[in-house]
Amino acid sequence: MLFTVSCSKMSSIVDRDDSSIFDGLVEEDDKDKAKRVSRNKSEKKRRDQFNVLIKELGSMLPGNARKMDKSTVLQKSIDFLRKHKEITAQSDASEIRQDWKPTFLSNEEFTQLMLEALDGFFLAIMTDGSIIYVSETVTSLLEHLPSDLVDQSIFNFIPEGEHSEVYKILSTHLLESDSLTPEDLKSKNQLEFCCHMLRGTIDPKEPSTYEYVRFIGNFKSLNSVSTSTHNGFEGTIQRTHRPSYEDRVCFVATVRLATPQFIKEMCTVEEPNEEFTSRHSLEWKFLFLDHRAPPIIGYLPFEVLGTSGYDYYHVDDLESLAKCHEHLMQYGKGKSCYYRFLTKGQQWIWLQTHYYITYHQWNSRPEFIVCTHTVVSYAEVRAERRRELGVEESLPETAADKSQDSGSDNRINTVSLKEALERFDHSPTPSASSRSSRKSSHTAVSDPSSTPTKIPTDTSTPPRPHLPAHEKMTQRRSSFSSQSINSQSVGSSLTQPAMSQAANLPIPQGMSQFQLSAQLGAMQHLKDQLEQRTRMIEANIHRQQEELRKIQEQLQMVHGQGLQMFLQQSNPGLNLGSVQLSSGNSNIQQLTPINMQGQVVPVNQIQSGVNAGHVSTGQHMIQQQTLQSTSTQSQQSVMSGHSQPTSLPNQTPSTLTAPLYNTMVISQPAAGSMVPIPSSMPQNSTQSATVTTFTQDRQIRFSQGQQLVTKLVTAPVACGAVMVPSTMLMGQVVTAYPTFATQQQQAQALSVTQQQQQQQQQQQQQQQQQPQQAQQPQSQQSSQDQPHPSVQQPAQLTQPPQQFLQTSRLLHGNPSTQLILSAAFPLQQSTFPPSHHQQHQQQQLHRHRTDSLTDPSKVQPQ
C-alpha cells in the first residue's frame, strides 16, 4: 500500500510539473507575441515617417515632375548640398571681411558707399589710354556722364603737360607685362600716380577747370575676366575690344579726389521720375510734406515744416527760381526750371516742380501753393540747358535724336554707323597714343617710336570725336532746301571722307584680309543707307515742288479772272467790294461796293436777263468780271429814266455760298425806275420759258411754278444803289440790273391813259403830303420795316429758259444810299388790297423826292 501511495504521490507531482511547464511556455509565447507586435508597430511608424520625409524632400528638389524613388531623391539631395557647399565656399572667399562692412549691407551697396565716402570712382583704361569703363559716381565728382568718357582717350581729359608722364607710366608697364603671367599681374602690378582731370560743364564754352586726382589700381588681364561681371563691364569690353588687340591688358583703378568735397555737386539718381508732393504758404514755407519725400530728400516732414524752401536751393539757381515764383504769383500755376535741392545727406539732387495756387472756397483768396516735385537726372538737365544755349549734345545723344526725327521705316542706323567708323578709329597700331591723337585733333598717326601726340593747345573744352559722315549728314539736313539734290553725288560726297580716312589709315601687319573686307563691307552698307536716304529726300522735294506748282497755277487762275473779295473778321458778314458782272461786248464798271450782311445764302442757280445768266464762280470763289452789254435781240426792256440794255452771259449752273449783309447795294448811274428782277431755280436747263405778265384786268399771272415777285419801289438817288433783302425764298441771291433797256415794241404793256391817270394821282398826293415833308426821315425809316408795292413791267424774252426770282422781304437800308425801286408805270390802287394804301402813299412821297433829284434832260419820254 505504501508503494501505491508513493506512486500516486509521484504521479501527482509529475502532473503538476507538466502543467507548470506548459503554463510557463504559454506565458513566454504571449510575451514574445506582444513584443513582436510592438516591434512591428514601431517599425511601421518609422517607415511611414521615412516615406513622408522622402516625399517632402522630393517635392523640394527641382525637376520633380515625375515620381522619383527614394534613392533618386537622396542622390539629388546630395548633389544639391554639395553644390551649395561649393558656392558658399566661393562666396566666403570673395566676401568682404566682416570687420569692414556691416552685415546688413550687400557687396554692391558697400562698394557704392565706399566710393562716395572716398570721393572716388572706378576707371578701366587700356594701355593706349582708351577708357573702356567708368562708374556712375564720376558724375557727382567731375560732372561727366559715363557716356562722355567711355570710348574716349584719357589724354583728352588730362592737361597737355602731363601727357608724357601718364603715357610713360602706361607704356612702361606694357613692356614689362609681356613677360608676366596672369598670376603675376594679380600680385605684382599695383600702380599709383596723380594727375589732373578735366571737369565737365554744361556750357562747353566755359573756361576749363581741372581737378587734382589720384589713381590707385592694378593691371588686369582681360583674358581672365569672368563671364559674369557687374555694371555692364563685360559688355563694354566685348564692344570695344576687337580680336586685333594683342595685349589684352587694362588698368583698373580707383580715382579719388585729392581734395574731398563736403557737399557733392549732385548724387546719382537710381530711379529718375520719382515724385513727391509738398504744400507751401504764399511766403514759400513748408506746410505739408507727403510720405514719398523722405526716401528722396532724406528729411522727415517735421524737419522741414515751417522752414523756407529757399534754404534748400542752390545759390546759382535762386535767381531763376525767383522768376518762376513771380510767374506763379501772376498766373496762378506754372512749371519751374531745373534746380538743385540739398538733401539731408549733403548732396544736390536735381528737381523740377509743377505748382498751382489754391483759393479759399468762401472768399476766393489765395490760400496756399501745391507743388509736385519730380526728380530728374543730370543728363536730362544738361541736355535741356545745352538746347537752350544752342549747343549740340555729344555724338551718341545727337545720333539718337536725329534717328527719332526721321521716319521709323526710313531711319538711318546710327549705331551701326558709329560702330562702322569706330572700326577704323580702333584699328590697332604699335603707337599707344595714335588713337587718342586721331580722336582729339584728327592729325596724322604718329610714328611707333615717337612720343605721344598731344592734344590741341586750346583746352577750354574737352575735345570730342567727330565722325565725318555724321558731320556731312548734319550739314546736309540743316542746309536742306526746296531745290533737288543729286542722290549719287550726295551719297558719294557723304561717304568720301570716311573712305579717304580708311585709305589713309595705316594697316597693321597683323591685320588679316578678312578684317579688311569686313570693314569695306560695313562702309559699303553705310553708303547704301545714305544713298537710300538721299533718294527719299529727293522724292519728297519733287512731291513738294509739284504741289507748289499746282498752288501757283490756282493762284494765277484766281488773279487772272479778276473778282476779289475781302473778308473782314470784325463784321459778321462778307464785304464785297466793286463787284462787276460779266456779259457780252461792252464793259460797264460798278461804282458802289456790294455789302451783304446777315446770313449765308447758298445759290444753286442764278439766271437773270434774257439769257439764263448767273454770277459766275470758279471753285467756290467769286470772280470779278466786267458788266457787258449784249445784242438787242437778247435784251430785256424796262421803262426807266436812264436805261441801258444789259444782260448776263448764259453759264452752267454753279453754287455760290457767301454770308450776306442785310443790304446788298449795286450801283447804277441811272435815275430811279421800276426794276424787274428775273431769276430762276430751274431743275432742268431745258425747261420752257416762263414770263410774268400783266393783263388788262390788272391781275398778275405766272406761267410756270410757284413764283412770288417782290414789291420794289424805286427812287433815283445820286449813287444809284439797289438794295437786296437778306431773306430770300430758296436762298437765291438777288441781283438787280444797274441799267435797263427800253424798246419801243415792249412799251405797249401800259397805255398812255394809265400814265396820265397815275401822274394826276401823284400830283394830288404830293399836295396832300407837303406838310409832312419835315417828317420824311421818320417815314422813310418806318418804310424800311414795311413791304412796298411795286408794279413789274412784262418782259419779252428771246431766250426760252427764263424764270423770275422769288423773294419774301422788302429791301431796306440806309436812306442816304437806298434806292427804292418804284414802279415807273404803277397800276391802279385797286390792284392791291386796302392794307397797302398807306404804303402806296409813302411810295408817292419817295416819288416826289425822285422828281426833285432827277435830271429831266436824262429821262426818256414815255
Curated annotation (Swiss-Prot):
Record's keyword annotation contains Transcription: yes
UniProt cross-link Glycyl lysine isopeptide (Lys-Gly) (interchain with G-Cter in SUMO1), position: K67, K858
Transferase as UniProt keyword: yes
Enzyme class: transferase
Post-translational modification: Ubiquitinated, leading to its proteasomal degradation.
All copies of domain bHLH, residue ranges: 34-84
One Gene Ontology term of the molecular function aspect: E-box binding
Region annotation Interaction with SIRT1: where it falls in the sequence: 450-570
Domain PAC: 336-379
UniProt GO cellular component terms: chromatoid body; chromosome; CLOCK-BMAL transcription complex; cytoplasm; cytosol; nucleus; perichromatin fibrils; transcription regulator complex
InterPro entries recorded: bHLH_dom, CLOCK-like, HLH_DNA-bd_sf, Nuc_translocat, PAC, PAS, PAS-like_dom_sf, PAS_fold
Induction: Without light exposure, high levels at ZT6 and low levels at ZT18 and ZT22. Light exposure increases levels in the SCN in phase dependent manner. Levels increased significantly during the subjective night (ZT10-20). In the piriform cortex, levels increased by light at ZT14.
Positions marked as site (Important for interaction with BMAL1): H84
Residue spans of biased composition, Polar residues class: 405-416, 447-461, 638-652, 853-862
Highest taxon, organism lineage: Eukaryota
Biased composition (Low complexity): 478-493, 623-637
Post-translational modification Phosphoserine, affected residues: S38, S42, S408, S427, S431
Family annotation (PANTHER family): CIRCADIAN LOCOMOTER OUTPUT CYCLES PROTEIN KAPUT
Function: Transcriptional activator which forms a core component of the circadian clock. The circadian clock, an internal time-keeping system, regulates various physiological processes through the generation of approximately 24 hour circadian rhythms in gene expression, which are translated into rhythms in metabolism and behavior. It is derived from the Latin roots 'circa' (about) and 'diem' (day) and acts as an important regulator of a wide array of physiological functions including metabolism, sleep, body temperature, blood pressure, endocrine, immune, cardiovascular, and renal function.
Complex formation: Component of the circadian clock oscillator which includes the CRY proteins, CLOCK or NPAS2, BMAL1 or BMAL2, CSNK1D and/or CSNK1E, TIMELESS and the PER proteins. Forms a heterodimer with BMAL1. The CLOCK-BMAL1 heterodimer is required for E-box-dependent transactivation, for CLOCK nuclear translocation and degradation, and for phosphorylation of both CLOCK and BMAL1. Interacts with NR3C1 in a ligand-dependent fashion. Interacts with ESR1 and estrogen stimulates this interaction. Interacts with the complex p35/CDK5. Interacts with RELA/p65. Interacts with KAT2B, CREBBP and EP300.
Name of protein: Circadian locomoter output cycles protein kaput
The organism's taxonomic lineage, starting at the top: Eukaryota, Metazoa, Chordata, Craniata, Vertebrata
